[in-house]
Design a protein with these regions (language model features):
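TPR alpha-solenoid repeat register
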Residues: 56-58, 73, 107, 141, ...
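Canonical tetratricopeptide repeat
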Residues: 59-62, 76, 110, 144, ...
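Canonical positions in the second alpha-helix
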Residues: 47, 96-97, 130-131, 200
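N-terminal leader/linker segments that initiate helical-solenoid repeat arrays
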Residues: 17-61, 65-72
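Short coil turns that delineate tetratricopeptide repeat
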Residues: 52, 68, 102, 136-137, ...
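Short coil/turn linking the two alpha-helices of tandem helical-hairpin repeats
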Residues: 117-119, 146, 151-160, 221-224
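Short coil/linker segments at helix-helix boundaries
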Residues: 58-67, 151-196
Length: 225
């Protein structure tokens, strides 16, 4: 008998045993009206799982943004869209959450992660710089910025060297300019990468950071010879 009950149960779609997003969102509205904020947030989390886009519409049209529950709802939407890999939407709601908590390091880091996922690398750099301004020991930010400045510097150095090699018979002035460009690049790029990666090593024994620092040391020797 139990086996037949299990077979019959498996034949019904799960939606028959779960609440739809619109039902959950009506309950969210009722919970908010009665002051049950914790329950409202819990219901909203369930509604995100049931239908994230319907929950999003509820947030934009029904939620009072001046209430304390608004940032909690924004967080639920951000985390839901991140979980389902809709990084554009997740980024939108982490940015929304920053409107409520602009100096929250965890939110800034999540926002930067989504910027990287969305291909907004320059924006991620700016966001991670905000992070280290608030928390100089943030491992993720230091690691990203160290790698960012190193890779950018490598690209710039290759261009400087390629341009110089195009000169069949460089003059003293052209050679001096070439050396000066390398020196300026080291000061503006490689040195920043080194500072961030050295900070990484004080926080975590990263072999990759150590290898990159060795490469920077070789570049410095070449620049200063």
């Amino acid at each position: 008998m139990k086996i037949w009950m299990l077979i019959m149960f498996s034949m019904f779609p799960l939606t028959m045993f779960s609440q739809s997003a619109d039902v959950l969102l009506r309950k969210v509205a009722d919970a908010l009206a009665s002051g049950q904020t914790g329950y409202a947030v819990s219901l909203f989390r369930q509604s995100c799982q049931a239908d994230g886009h319907e929950a999003e519409m509820f947030y934009w049209t029904e939620v009072d943004k001046s209430e304390n529950t608004a940032p909690q709802f924004a967080r639920e939407l951000a985390e839901h869209f991140k979980d389902v890999r809709n990084y554009t939407k997740a980024y939108l709601f982490y940015k929304e959450l920053l409107q409520y908590t602009p100096d929250n390091v965890d939110v800034l880091v999540s926002c930067a992660e989504m910027e990287v996922r969305c291909g907004k690398v320059a924006d991620a750099k700016a966001t991670y710089e905000q992070v280290v301004a608030l928390d100089s020991d943030n491992l993720q930010a230091c690691n990203f910025l160290g790698s960012y400045y190193f890779l950018k510097s490598e690209d710039a150095r290759k261009k400087i060297e390629a341009d110089f090699k195009k000169l069949s018979s460089p003059t003293r002035m052209q050679y001096a300019r070439y050396r000066n460009n390398l020196s300026s690049l080291f000061d503006s790029g490689y040195s920043k990468a080194r500072a961030y990666l050295q900070q990484v090593l004080t926080l975590f024994p990263s072999s990759e950071a150590g290898k990159t620092l060795e490469k920077i040391k070789l570049v410095e020797q070449e620049v200063n010879k």
